[in-house]
Amino acid sequence: MKMQDKLNQIKELALVEIKEAKDSTTIDTIRVKYLGKKGELTTILRGMGSLSKEERPIVGKLANEVREVLEAELEAITKAVKEAEKQEKLKNEVIDISMPGKKQTIGKKHPLEQTLDEMKKIFVSMGFAIEDGPEVEKDYYNFEALNIPKNHPARSEQDTFYINDNVVLRTQTSPVQARVMEKQQPPIKMISPGKVFRSDAVDATHSPIFYQMEGLVIDKDITFADLKGTLELFAKKMFGDKVKTKFRPHHFPFTEPSAEMDATCFVCNGKGCKVCKGEGWIEILGCGMVHPQVLRNCGIDPEVYSGFAFGFGVDRMVMLKYGIDDIRLLYESDMRFLNQF
């Protein structure tokens, strides 16, 4: 069979196959079969070297004409098939306007953020400034400046995430207080809210990451009475005028004397329930008068100035306020839970 006859035969067969193609996959198969690197038309073009000088231009011209015809037909059928596939897809995906729509979820503040904002608002109204500091903290500010020496059990790797020997993930927001005292002379009146980190196993009451808010007041002639008055006022603003408070002796290395403040259970109003374990009282915070050594470490003369400090676990405040019995619920992003707040 002459080369011209082969080309005409390829053209006729290809046009028949193109006309019968119904989908994109079939069209691609035809394109490869005739025009691909190993296609029938390409094979003929590669064999032109065996033709005589007189035949080459004739066969070359015919081969190019066949290629142009096939490419044009393939392009036309491709457009037609794609449009048909598009219309079929639209037909199958038509929206039934009688069906109920999907409700859009509207974001809002997490209960932790809500409680933090409420606490900050109360303290700002009492004249406190809000201070911030690094979460990756120097060992000195997290421990030594706060009267926690190198052999203190709180510095154990079981309780603290160490980056290296001199850097930790802060275990409290107290380092912010130390940094402020170094840079600012009294009077100082500040709170430092933020995330802290402890090497705790996750359970219903413990999390390796949680929120704290700590406060500090330094000035001349500050007494424990000032501490009590400040925290009692906060409790009334936070939980209502009927709340009662009491202070119990405790120990913290950075305050002396130290105490814990309890408030009447705001679930049962002091009558006793499962939240307060039948006692009618709930532990709210730790507090005390700033230890003289802490003042010295931060460049403040304890013979001239005194002060008090306090600290809340914000997660605990949220749990107590809303009667939540598992801290993990605050971090699981379950909208069924979060939509209640």
Swiss-Prot record:
GO BP, one annotated term: phenylalanyl-tRNA aminoacylation
CDD domains, sorted: PheRS_alpha_core
Superkingdom of the source species: Bacteria
Gene Ontology annotations for the cellular component aspect, listed alphabetically: cytoplasm
UniProt main location, coarse: cytoplasm
InterPro entries hit by this protein: aa-tRNA-synth_II, aa-tRNA-synth_II/BPL/LPL, Phe-tRNA-synth_IIc_asu, Phe-tRNA_ligase_II_N, Phe_tRNA_ligase_alpha1_bac, Phenylalanyl-tRNA_Synthase, tRNA-bd_arm
Chain sites annotated for binding Mg(2+): 256
Required cofactor(s): Mg(2+)
Textual note on the cofactor: Binds 2 magnesium ions per tetramer.
Compartments in which it is found: Cytoplasm
Catalysed conversion reaction: tRNA(Phe) + L-phenylalanine + ATP = L-phenylalanyl-tRNA(Phe) + AMP + diphosphate + H(+)
Keywords, comma-separated and alphabetical: Aminoacyl-tRNA synthetase, ATP-binding, Cytoplasm, Ligase, Magnesium, Metal-binding, Nucleotide-binding, Protein biosynthesis
Similarity-based family: Belongs to the class-II aminoacyl-tRNA synthetase family. Phe-tRNA synthetase alpha subunit type 1 subfamily.
PANTHER family: PHENYLALANINE--TRNA LIGASE, MITOCHONDRIAL (PTHR11538:SF41), PHENYLALANYL-TRNA SYNTHETASE (PTHR11538)
Subunit: Tetramer of two alpha and two beta subunits.
Protein name as it appears in the record: Phenylalanine--tRNA ligase alpha subunit
Species annotation: Clostridium perfringens (strain 13 / Type A)
